[in-house]
Regions:
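Amphipathic, Lys/Arg-enriched alpha-helical "gate/interface" segment within cytosolic domains
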Residues: 2-150
């Protein structure tokens, strides 16, 4: 059963039995809201020993350069060291700017990642990949650069 967690600018759900965390941005965006939200998610990942993480980027306006730097230089290296994290499902919106920003961030940090990352066009496919593991994620979006599968 999913528990709703609360944070000002995020919709958060946690399933303790699956060790799964889902989050999606809500509301307006600025660095003063984004950075504490990212830090809160990072704290939950460690505190709750999350193994399966869904980051839904729908609703997130264009990421500022300062926030991209924060994620790539501080957050991602710390998250990469979490031994319990197994899979990250990124649900991408149709916002091409954010798709490219995420691709760039993960490309730079890819050498440090110890968990699987897949991109999806919808949350249902992301949940399916996490809770029904297979060798080849058939519902994953093939490439961010090629766009999203509807």
């Amino acid at each position: 059963m999913m528990d709703a967690l609360y944070f000002d600018s995020l919709t958060l759900f946690h399933d303790p039995a699956l060790r799964l965390l889902y989050h999606r941005w809500r509301g307006t965006y600025n660095s003063h809201l984004f950075q504490p939200a990212v830090q809160h998610v990072q704290q939950l990942l460690g505190q709750l020993r999350i193994e399966y993480w869904i980051a839904d980027l729908n609703g997130l306006p264009n990421l500022g350069l300062e926030d991209q730097f924060l994620i790539s230089e501080q957050v991602l290296p710390q998250v990469a060291r979490m031994p319990h994290l197994r899979q990250l499902a990124l649900v991408l919106s149709s916002n091409v700017y954010n798709q490219l920003a995420v691709e760039s961030i993960l490309h730079l940090g890819n050498e440090h990642l110890r968990f699987d990352v897949q991109y999806f066009s919808d949350a249902a496919s992301a949940f399916d990949w996490l809770i029904n593991p297979t060798d080849a994620p058939a519902t994953a979006a093939p490439s961010m650069a090629a766009g999203l599968v509807a």
